[in-house]
Structure formats: C-alpha cells, structure tokens
Amino acid sequence: MEPTINPPVNLPPPVPSRSNLSLNYSNNNTNNTNNTNNTNDFKKKLQFQLQSSPSSPSSPSPSIIYKKTPAVNNNNNNNNNNNHINNGNVNGIGPGGGNSYISSPQSSPIHTSSNGISYTVTTNSPPLLPVDNSSGYNNNLNSTFVETLSSSSPSPIKTTTTPPPPVPSKSKSKSSEKLSVKLLKSNSKPSLNDLYQQQQQQSNPNSPTTPPSNCNIESIQPPSSSSSSTTPSTSPQLPAIYSKYSKISLPQLPLPPFLPPSPLVQSTSSPSFSSLILPLPSSPLPPPPLTIPNKVPPLPMRLPPPPPPQQLDQMYSNNNQQQQQQQQQQQNNESNSTTTSEGGLTPESESKLYEIASQPPSTPRLTHESKVIPSEIELLIKFYPSPSLSSGSLLTIPSTIEKSFIFSPCSTVDEILSIIIPNFQFHNGLKCFAKHTFNNEWEATHNDPAAASSSIIDDHESFALFNQKSPTIPLHKEKTILELSLHDRDVLILKTVSLVFTLVKVQIPHFTENSLSATATVKFNQFTSIRSIIRKLYLKYHNNVDISRHGIFLINDNNNNNNNNNNNNNNNNNNNNNNNNNNNNNNNNNNNNNNNNNNNNNNNNNNNNNLHQQQDELSSSIQLEEEELFSTYNINSNSNLVFRTISNQENDILNSSQKILNLKILISSTFSRNNTLNLMFDPRDSVSKAIKVTGLRTGLLDSLNKCGFYLTPSEDDDEGFWMDEELTLEMYNLKNHTFLSFKERCKKYTILIKMGGASNGNGNGDLTWRKCTFKFDQFTKVSTLFNILINNENIKNPKDYHLVVKSTGTSLEKHRYLWSYDIKSPYEIEFKEYPNKLLIFNPQNGEKNFVYVDFNEPIKDVCARLSQTFSSPIDFGSISTNNNNNNNNNNNINSNSNGSSGAGGANSNALTSSTNSASTTSSSTPTTPELPPQVNHVRERSYTFKRLGQLNNTIDSRKSLKDQGVLPNDALMLEVIQDDSIATNNNNNNNNNNSNTTTTIKDKKINRNSLPSSTTMVFEDLVKDGTILSEERQINIWDEPADSNGNIIYSKTVTNNLNAEIDAATLNKLIIRLTNPVFHDLTFMKTFLMTYSSYTTTTTLLKKLFERFQVPTHIDERERLSAQLRVANVIKYWVEHHYEDFCHESTKLMVDFVDTHMMIAFPTLGVQIRNCILKRTCGFKSELVRTRSNGALTSPRTNLSLSFTNLNNSSVGSIANTSSSTSTSSTSSLLSSTNSISISSSLSLSFNSGINSPSISQNTPSSPSLIPSSPRPITSSSSVSSSTLLKSPLSQQAKSRIPETKTKGFANPRNLFDFDDEEIARQLTLYDFQLYTAIKPTEFLNQAWNKPSMASRKSPTILKIISRFNDISLWVVSLILEPDRVKTRAKRLKRIISIADELRKLNNYNTCIAVISGINNSAILRLKYTRGLLSKKYLDILENLEKEMSCEGSYKNYRDKLKNSDPPVVPYIGVYLTDLTFIEEGNPNIIRGNLINFAKYYLIYRVISEIQQYQWTEYQLNVAPIIQTFIRDVSISSTSDDLYHLSLLKEPRNALKSDIF
C-alpha cells in the first residue's frame, strides 16, 4: 500500500556546515541502481521552490507545472541515452545558488521519478528559464532546504516525449505564454514529527498513490515502463525544542557559489491536477555551461542548532499569521472559482492576473506626489472679554467681537494672533495695551504704569486661541493650521487667560571638555513648549553643547532616593572596615590582609552600585517630547530636569527593537554650503515631527515651520516631491541612508499695512503701520495675498490699493507668483493705497505735470519731494507770494537777494548781460533739475500748495491733501514759503522802471533761445577735453559771405561744387546747403536733422529756418518761392520724423510761424504742418494749454515717456479744418483744441529723476511703461510702433505666419524652467525688441549714456538696455548657482545653453551675448564638476556661440553674422556704443575755431541709421503673459562678489569629487 502524500510544509532542514556542502553527481555513461529518497523530501524541495520564487509585478518569475504520474520500476539494464540526475538537487530544481535553471527542449515535458511517484514538468517556454528571486526577498532562500542523500548512487530516469497539455491563454501576445505548477492541495497541516516519521516508512512502488480526500484527482494513465525499487532511509529524531515550533521556517544559510546546475531528465506526462498559472518573463536568460564533477561526496545528515527561544517565538507568530493568510486566500480563491478546465484558472482570474503582472513596478515618484497646500483658509474668530479684565481698566471693549478672517494654512497660531489682535484694535475698537513678548505671548498690560510695575510675577494676562470643539484646551502656539487639522469656516475663540510662570533648574552635564556640569534656570508658563526651551538653551550654549543629539529628560526622584540610601549604607560599611583595619594593623598582618580584601570587595560593591545607579537613572528618566508643552508633564519647580545627549544604551535599545531609520539629511541654504547630517528616526514618526527634529538638530531654529523634506528618486532637484507632513516615514518605504533634502518650502512674508483715518490702539487717528506675517509656498500668487488683506482689513474699494516691495519699491502684479519676485529677507511688502494723480503748475516757466502723490502724507513732505522732480528747476528768487511783483514790464530780478537760496551767493561767478525789452518776453529753456547749493547761513526753503485763482493760500502744509479736501486730478500750484524778511526784500526789488536785469548764475549756460538772432550772444558748447568754443557774432543767414576757407570746407578741392560733400562749415552754410533751392540732398538733410543737437539747439535752428524763409525783396520771385518751399519741406520732414525734438517753447514758435507766415504763402502745406503738429502732440505728449497764471504761459513738461492712444480721423479732421488766422487768438484756439483732445487720452508719466517709485500706467499701474517712440513718420504705412505689437490686432495673413506658442508648463509653473526653451527665447526676444525700438536717435549723441550728469535725461532707453544686459548676465549666474546638487546645476546649465542657442536662431544677439557673458562669469567658470557633466553636444553649442560672439577683431565674426541676418534683428547694442565712442573721441566737434566738423557727423549718422533700420521690421510672435511675468524683472540684489562667494560655497577650492557628489 502506498503511503499517503501530504502537502509539504516549511520543514526545518538539516543544515550542514558550509565547508562540507557537496552534491553527488554521476556521469552519463554510468549505470547505477537508483537509490530513491523519501517522497516528502522531494515535495518539500518543490514546495520551497514555489515559496522562494514568488511572482510579483515588480519581479516576475517563471512558473512550473508539476504533474503527478504513477512511476514504473526501472531496471538496472536500462542503457538508453538518458540523462541522470540526483534526486537530492538543491533549491528544488537544479542546484546553483541564487538562480536555478530548467534546461529542456521547448514544448516538451520533463518527467522525474522518485519513490514510485513520477513528476512531470511541462514547459511552453524557451529552453532555459531562470528561477528568479524577486527583489525585496532574501537571496539566500535557496539554501533553506538541503537534500539529504541516503545513498551516493543516483537512479536513472527514463525519458519520453509527449505533447504538452493545453494551457489557457488570455490573448495572442507573448505574455500569454505561461509555465504552470500543479500540486496537491490539502488543508491539513501535519506536524514536524509526523513528517520525519513518514521518512522512515517504506514506500510501495507498485501501489498507486492515495491522495488526500479533499484533492480532486483526475484519472491517471500509467506509462508502460516499470518503476525502480526503493531503499528506505532513516532520519534522526528532532530535538525537543522543535516540538513547539513545528511549523516554523528557520533562517536560511547560503549555498556556495561554485555548485553547478544539473539538467533534468525528460519523461512522459499525464493529465494534470488544479494548477496555479503565473506569467513568464519576457526574455529568459541564456543557459550557462554545464560542468558536472565526476565525484562529489555525499552531504552529511545534520540538523541546525536550535535558535534562541525569543526568535522562535517571533518566527512562530509570523508563521501562524502567514498560514492564516494563505488559508483565507485559498478559501477566497475556491469561492471565486466557478469552473476549471485542465486545472487552469477561469478567464476572469487569468485576466486579473495578467493585469497585475503587466503593471510597472511601483516607485515613490509614481505613488507619491507633492501634496498641494491650500493657499488660504477662512476661520471665524470670536472674542469674549475675560470676566477678570472686563471690569477693570486693563481691557475695554464695547461688545463681543465676531469676525471672519482669511489666513495662510502654513501660519502658526502665534502668527494668527499677530494678525487678529492688531486688527481688532484698529477696526473693532478693542482698546488694550497688548504687547508681544519675547516668549511669543500676547500679554495684556495695565493702563496705569504704577499698577503694572507693582504687579507680581504671576499677575499676567495673555491672549490665547481655543477651538470651539474643545474650548478648555488652548491651541499650541507653535503649531500651524495644517498641523491642527483646521478646516474652512471652523470657529476659534479668542480669550484672555492668566499666565502662571514657573522657575525650574535644568542640569547640563559635561558642559565643557573637562566634563564640568552647569545649571540653567528656565522660566516657563503653561503655554511654553519643550522645543522653545531647547531653542533657548541652544542659543545660549551652542558653543559648549552639541545639540545634534540633545534632549531634555525628567528624572524620577523615587529611584534616586533609593539609590542614595544604598550608597550611604555602603559608604558607612566601608568606613567601618577601614577603621577596623587601622586598629588591627599592628596586631596581626593576616587580619590586615583580610581586611584589605574586605575593603576591596566593598569598593567593588560601591563601583557596582554606582553603575547600577546610572543604569537606574537612565531607566527612570523620561525624555520630554519636543512637540509637547511643559504643562503636559506637570513640571514644577521641584522637578529634576537634565539637558543631555541620548545615551548609547538608549540607542542600543532602539536598535534592538529594529525600528530605527537612519536618514541622511541634506541641509539646503542659499548662502551656505550644503551640510549632510545623519539622523535616526522611528519609522512610525510623522514627517512633521521629523522635520522639526531636524530643524532643532541643525540649528536652523527659525525654519521649523518653513522647511520640509524634499524626496528625489534621482539626484535631480526638479524631479522630486515634497513629503506629506501628515504621513509617517514608513509609508514612503524609505531605506537606510536615504538622502532627504531639508529646504525651505514656505517663505515668511512680513506685510506692512499702511492705513489712515481710523482709530488705532492709541486712540488717535494718525497714520500707522501695522505688521502681520504670512507663510506661502511657491504656488501662491500675489492675488491670494491681496485678497486676504482686502478681506481682513474690510476694504470696500480694492482697486485703490496695491502691494509694493519695501526695499525696491516694485509694485507686485497680481497674476504673478510671490516667489517669482526676488524679495530679500526680511521679505517686507507694503500694502497701501495707490498714489493719486495731481496736476501741478510751475509758475516760473508754465510747466504743468501730472504727478502721483500720496494723499495721506503731509503736504510739506509731498512738496519737498516734488520740488526736485521738475525738468526745469524752480527759480527760487522769482517765485513770490506777493501779488505786487508784476507791475512793470521790465522788473529788477535779483537772484542773489538776502535770505534766499539763490544760485551761489557771494561765491558764485556773476555774468551780467544787457538785454533790451524784447528779451524779457521769451522764456528760458528747461534745464536739468538742480537744487541750489546750501550755505550754512541760508535757511532751507520749504514749499506748499496753492489753489489756482485764490489770492490767499488756505492750505495747511502740516496736514494731508485728503484732510484739506483736495481731490485727485485737482490743479494746484507749487509755492515757496518765505519769511517776512524775504518778502520785504522782494518788494523793494520791484519798484524801479526801465532798469537793467541782472542775473547771477553758477555753472549755467546763457540761454540762446531768449536772444534774437540779430543780437550778440555767447555761443557755448562742450567739445573734446571739456574746452569751450570761442564767441562768435551770429549774423543773418542772408548776410553770410560767399564760400571761402573761413566758412566752408569741401571734401574735394573744387569749391562751389553743389554735389561735393561738406567736411566742415559754419551753421549758416549748413542751413543754406540744407535749403538749397537748386537740388535736394536727402542724405545731408537726414544727417543734419539727426545730429544738429550736438552743435546747436532746436530754437536756434527754427529761427535760422525762419530767416531763410523770409527772403529779401531783391531776390528773384522764382528763387524766393523755391527757397521758401524748401524750408517748408524741411520743417515738415523735421516734424514728422523728429517730433521728440520739440519742447513747449519750440512748438509755440512753430505754431506762431505757421499761422503768421506759412498759411499765407503755402496754405495747403501750412495745414499739413499743423496737422503733423497736432498728431504728434495730441496723444503722444501731454496737452498744451494756454492758461494765464501770473502772466505766464503754462504747459506740461516735455521729457515724459507717455503711452498714447491714437486719435480717430474725425477728431483730427475737425481740427485740421478749423479756420486759421495770424492773430494770437488763432494760436490759442489751436492749443485749446489740442488740450481738449489730449485730456481724453490715457497718460502714463515716467519722470527721469526725483521720485523713486516706478512709473504707473492707468490700465496696469503696477507695470512700468515700456512704450517706445517709433522713428517712423506718422504718415507712413508702418505707423504702428513696435511697442503696439503686444496690443494691436494683426491681419489674417500675419497671423498665419506666427508660429504656434509652445504651452509646456503653462498649467502650474514653479519657475522659468518649467517652460519650453524655445518659447522662453521668444518671450525674451519680444521684450528686448520692445526696448530696442524705444531708442531715439538723439540718445546716441555726445556719449550722453556715458555721462552721469545727463545720462538719465538724454539717454534713458540706452541706460535701460545696458542695465538689462547686466541684469541678465548676473541673473544667469544666479540661476545656475541656485540648485544645491551638482547634477541639477549641470541640468540648469544645459537649459541655459539651449536658450542661448534659440536666441541666436531668433537673431536676438543682444540677449544671446548677455547669456554667454553670464555663462563665462568667473563664478561659473570655476565650477569644474558642474561643467564636467555637460555632454559633447552642449559643449559644442557653447563653443560655437562663443566663437560667433567673440570680441576678437572688433567683433568681426559677429559683424559678419549680423550683415547676413535677415530682419527682424535685435543687435548687440555694445558694438554700436563702442563705434560711437571711437568716433566721438577721435574727431573734434569744431575745427578752425568756428567750423562745425560735419564729416564727423556723417560717420555718426551712418551708425545711427544702421541702428534704425533694424527697428522697422517687427517679430511675428505671440505674447505669453505668464512667461513675461518671469522675464520682465530679472534684476537681483546680489552683486558679482556675492555670487562668487556663493560659488565657493557650492564647490569649494580643492574639493574632492566625493565632497561634491
């Protein structure tokens, strides 16, 4: 009768010594008798093969189909060509260690016979399949069971070939090929002793095997061959210790790697039982060569030594759990299975298994993502006055306050209190003297200072927040809203509670290197946290104490008292023994020796007692959790606290529990080198707790609620995610020595709220600044912060408020992210009202300006700032408060009167000029604003406003404009406040008639515009080396003598040649050539009108043209008309192409001349010129207004950068068709019409000096105006300037040529590198082209950009381009140095090189060279490890860029590249500035004393004309506003030295590769 076969269990195998491991193999030619082994041994081997090779989606392993067939006896004369295998193979099927291989022909079954039972292995797979041990499991599982051989002679196995049974497949894909294992199933679990008893039984090979009753056995067709006889084998009895743990899998031992694999012999197959089907690997490993030794000694039979009982208990419990799970899974499988076919799974189960197997392996990057922190949370705050305070003088409140606030979820409770309490004081009438103490408490103090000083230490009231759900427990003030799990619309109660202070001593052992201890006295209350005390101890003792492993411990006093008593008793015994020894010393030496021995024993006892005392102290001490409060542990003044390191014994206890996670924390900081700190955590700890522990251990005490853990699966900062603070560390499957970046996740912004007109905490209505703090992550926009402030401050008109960076004055745009602004610590932002516009008149020159002022500031402060912003300075002697100053046409104006701050005083050089009555009617040209020099004895002037049309000034300069009732856009006049002595002196200076005018000036040129052409004037101009031109008597242009070497020099030797170029000539000769009636030289006219401002003024040129127009009567009529027509055409071209040259005075002269002369001679041409003037002044410039104020003509300033709105044709046509006359009234009507049109146009003023705040546009007040002035004539077809490219609609044909915008990263961008490189280059090009087209030709003259005194006034756009070029260069350096890891820096460098290459393709050479300049900065060039990670592709791109943009040979390669580039182009502005500098410095302005070097201006014109030709063709690109927000303001506060220092921190000098990577 054949014994019953029970399913295998985890049998503890006999484990031989590693040195004696061996296997017995036989040669293929040997015919030995098969010594069969026990069936259960082989089944155990197969069962373990299944258990040691689990199939999972992450590591699929092959499956095997074992089919059970009756075995036949094999004779010893079996000489067929069969392979022999020892039935004692290791690891179930084939030896070989970690991976065993099954070698068989494809689609052929393998039969193995043992003890009368035949096992058929059927494969539908390639010849060799690895038995893979999946990751996460022990690789030494193959050594669990070692086959024990009873005989060294293997048995031959017959090989037959049968077709494999059909295997159910899911689809035709390769993954449907499976390898199945079919075994008997049994729910009964035999004991270990039963299994060993079965090994001793003799198997009957002729009888069929009886399966268990619960197994569904199909009919089996026995093969024709006979089975071999078997020999019983013996097994030793198990030790007694295994009786309890009969179902435990013992630890496995690894097998030696030298054991070769063994082939399996094929046999016939039979019908199968129920099977488990698992997927095959896609690509099997190639078969290794088989080497079978001739003689291998058999393995000895040994049992492993019994493991400790503690480990056995743990293993036993684990094994029971596994068995229960397996039984539950089997029951589920049996209940789910409906039908079986050939032992396979149902189609539904197979489909499910296929889906699981096809899933990719799970990684932290796929399973975890950064948790989105909500940007805001709304909470309802209720305040109830405390009964103890409401009756006294400490707190006064009308009623209970209930208000809804919006907070940042990252803010702590203490920061919430800093928002609520001042808000209640300011808006809700909460009148109390609450102060924020150094202990982060909001204490309410007494109104009476005497009462406050006499109060005891416990007499303190503090504000605290309580959750309405638990009103008796105050909220932890150091925890954030996220940590407290608060939700929207939750109710918090604000109360005042009495503070109870406690003083306790904290012992600090081993305070210094000499192991001296110290004692610190700590003061705390019921709200004080353990962490705050550790922070204070660190700040005080960080030089003496290593805080990285420190904590506060509470010592149990009871155990200490017992230890002390024991020590005292031992000491008394020792003293007694010592006395006895001394007394008996002279009597008996033997007694002395005995006593000494006793003393030694006592001393040893004392030492042991001390050790026990330390151990008891460690065991009795409790480490105080840093998250908790002192009140949680009931700490009082008698508590014994110790501030010490965590002992080694505690570490050993933690390590023995196997619950320690050792992590490497990478500390990231902006201006410090990254440090790595090894910390140990309990995997069950929350991420929030680990973050705060890290903050304390690293000393970054202010970063506890701002930093977080950033986990990167790779070494790239940009591909990681933030760990969720609510989860535990073990949920992330972290391994030991995993790198975590500890860096800033939230930035703490301090908001300064500037509000006036309300009652503050002090009871008055003065303007106050209140501070509140918010924390925001990188995904928070400015609009979120703005809406929070609007809600909390109860603002009804949010359009009147904005946010401004305090340090730079930059206005924050609402659609941008807060982190996109480079706001430096302490991250202060001002929340205040928009400064409103005010129309200011300058009574000296009639200048009128729309300026932005703060209506809440005192008027004297506003006036003091505005007095320095006008284009022409206020004449401090001419502005008077008396109305009797203008009685006569010719007044005596003494600019050096006593008491005034005139220009120079006694030390100034006076230059006196006599003028006739006509000279007093003309106004001076606006000059650079300069404050008069201050003299010690001269009183500084102060100013105020005065309403127009009022005789007496009713405005109080000490109050604000809002308090005076001044409304926005009101017109006021700036007036000087003078004392009585000044007024009296001014009255005495205005009583003489027909007196000479004396003007005292200092470093000021004589204004040639105020003198007629027939008078003698001082002609000054700065030339090379600062010399001044000699005086010249200017004569009428019709009186200019004939050509001679004294007034004209031609480029050729032939004189009077009309076509010859002029090298030098007088001004009259140049104008004669300009208006030559015989021929027209267009190049000469362009050169002259572009460069005339270098040697004359607009007013002088106008007067000379007027002289040329007034032809003498003796000239022929035809010649007269030709000359006049040529003058009219020159004026028309001048107005059309150089309208920015005309100021108020020159425009007035032009209008008067057109109305009085040109409308008579050429009416049609006169109307065209008037229309050009209107088109250029209306909408492009501010309005021209003729208003009488103290007899002066008022007008707006002229050097303004304005955004314009084009006039409609009907308005222009109506003005052009108005009747003209020669009277002054017609001029007034023209100016009035101009005013009426321009009032409706939108103005955006940007002053060149004075006010520090940026220019504010009416539509987008936060963005600076970058609207360039187009050099194109307004009548041309391309009249739309390049600045309107972002605004003007394009035609369908133009839209079709615009490339599609690449929207990568538009959804939720964190930084600039979230966008596509090509799209970044496009947006940079659009912005730079906008700046480039704004350059005026006159900005390149006289090297104005290089002269600080006139640069901001003469060349403002060039300065902007130069500043942006330098900003981009430093910006690139900061972008590369920003990442902490070297691989991320290399990635940033690759992206920047790619952007530079795209800029070159777009012909944006200016920004391309700026980027290359940043890459070649010394702070980047020294980063050898960063550059070493660049691939050859990017190195070649960078090399080509550097070669093309090299400055060698005066930028020869770049000039060739630019010449061959098709527009649109943004050229490198530095090359043009260099060329102009060489021209200016290498050629004088004046030669031969009074001849203008016109050949020099030919060269200048050629350079400027080349610049202008690239301003005409515009880029056809779409604007991406979200990218523009990142590239608009690239200025950083760090200097080159700061960036170089940061580079040294990132990669120190002589740093090793291991230190960087």
UniProtKB/Swiss-Prot annotation:
Region Disordered, annotated ranges: 1-121, 146-181, 195-238, 283-347, 558-619, 881-937, 1254-1303
UniProt feature, compositional bias: Low complexity: 17-40, 52-63, 73-90, 102-114, 148-161, 195-207, 222-236, 311-333, 558-610, 881-928, 1261-1291
Residue ranges of domain N-terminal Ras-GEF in the record: 1058-1177
Swiss-Prot/TrEMBL keywords: Coiled coil, Guanine-nucleotide releasing factor
Protein's UniProt name: Ras guanine nucleotide exchange factor K
Gene Ontology, cellular component aspect: plasma membrane
PROSITE patterns found in the cross-reference section: RASGEF, RASGEF_CAT, RASGEF_NTER
UniProt biased composition (Pro residues): 1-16, 283-310
Bias kind Polar residues: ranges: 334-343
Source organism (scientific name): Dictyostelium discoideum (Social amoeba)
Coiled coil segments of this chain: 310-338, 591-629
UniProt GO molecular function: guanyl-nucleotide exchange factor activity
